[in-house]
């Protein structure tokens, strides 16, 4: 059955084409497996709470009749402003409009939140852009530049809020820098979510073609309920496609964790156990709460435009397993720098088990992709990442995170990074074990090698399942680097030891695989175990618990002073020619202008496959597809065939770099 929704209808109907519903949520209350909800263009000021799920063979489809024509917003228009002082205006809102959730009394904060807890989940928007929240009315009146902002010219637009308890009103002051808010498009967010079931287990929903914006979402760390403007809420088989997602206070789309009252922001509330311990507990408790391949995950997020959210574009802990995230454009995430903590990125996934992220364009984010804990069977492929770093000279905000294209943290692999274009100053931060980098172009460094893990021990899982197989600390290594291009594109400053999230790591800026010079080859490592003799537990204890795992490096090309690992036998090292790489944007399309292929000349390497990469050490799982099949790396960034020999980097032929990459 098709239900029709049109908020321009003269009155609320029964969902027929002749008498459509005025609200999407009216259809969401009754739609059942196999039904379609067709939504006419218009602005829908509502929270949609789907009651029923579909089945694998009979999905429930919510579709905008015109692509991006149906707009679901968490905000309300605010025109009732009075001039207060200088450029500052004031409005009052009766708190009844907020129901049981007032964004202007709810603070952003919780586990793994490092910035001062001074921001609210509420927001003021001028022409679809968030204003900066001030801590005091005086700061709002001054309207000065917020130095850590990545968009400093916009940071002079401020707002400040307080409560009038006698009148039960929220009072909002805003500095519009000379603009008259009664004549401009000004909104305030009032709803926490836009399209997300309030209960778990609402499966097999397709959400297609909507413009979703301006919700008062909350901080979403791994051992807590993770909400977004859109999200399946601990269910299976959703498709979120062809949507525009913007201006969430925290997260745009959540594939995240359910609410567990016994382990929700436990560290923040009780202090007596570390947030790391509670993350381990969350994994174990998830097994009890239905976290299996049969029940959870297997979602698809595709062809979405996600931007200007202040925590993540996409977030997920455990609920996103076995998912595909493809063909999305994600940019300008956390650019305001008013929120800070360990959960900020274009995509931030914990337990990305068998998750494939491919053909995404991610830029101008604090981080591009962050796979934290249990990146087992995770594959990042054919992504374009650039400008995931602050503007030059921008000071770091209190609680802000370091920047890079990809961060893999405290997982045991196998984590596969292949055929990507990484153009930011740091390509991969790797405080982890079990990574394979194959056929990438990297202009930035490999950093945090051998550090950033502390004494944490994290789970690994039964192959291609969620069930926990074991826990282990980090020996570091167990990494592979084949057929990559490394170019020292940015100036090098002296390596320094930095502390982030309480964990120390080397912040290396030199490009190349030389950071693994002290790591053993496989033959060196295996020789310690004396396989021809009886096992001696005390003698082997250091090699079980303290020594690095082996690293495999071969077939890479190095330019502009990028350095190779001492154990690499076959490579191309060119320190004579000056290689240039320029990302060219024209009419919204991107290509690369480079001379690197002039100097690669006839250097070729072998075709890599899953058997060459082998097995990640702790889970004893091969670098393979989620269905267990072999990967042969004979397709490049654009899907072109490589043939019997391979050129290093993401292209089968150098001429492809000048083609449209996005």
Language-model segments: which ranges?
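Predominantly extracellular/luminal carbohydrate-interaction, adhesion, and secreted-enzyme modules
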Residues: 228-230, 312, 345-346
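Right-handed parallel beta-helix
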Residues: 203-216, 236-250, 260-286, 292-312, ...
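N-terminal pre-domain segments of enzymes
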Residues: 1-2, 658-662
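Extracellular polysaccharide-degrading/modifying enzymes targeting complex plant/algal/animal polysaccharides
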Residues: 2-234, 239, 244-246, 252-254, ...
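Non-catalytic carbohydrate-binding regions of carbohydrate-active enzymes
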Residues: 423-428, 438-462, 487-491, 495-501, ...
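Long, structured stretches of catalytic cores involved in phosphate-ester chemistry, encompassing
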Residues: 462-463, 475
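Short catalytic-loop micro-motif centered on adjacent basic/acidic residues
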Residues: 38, 231, 313-315, 369-370, ...
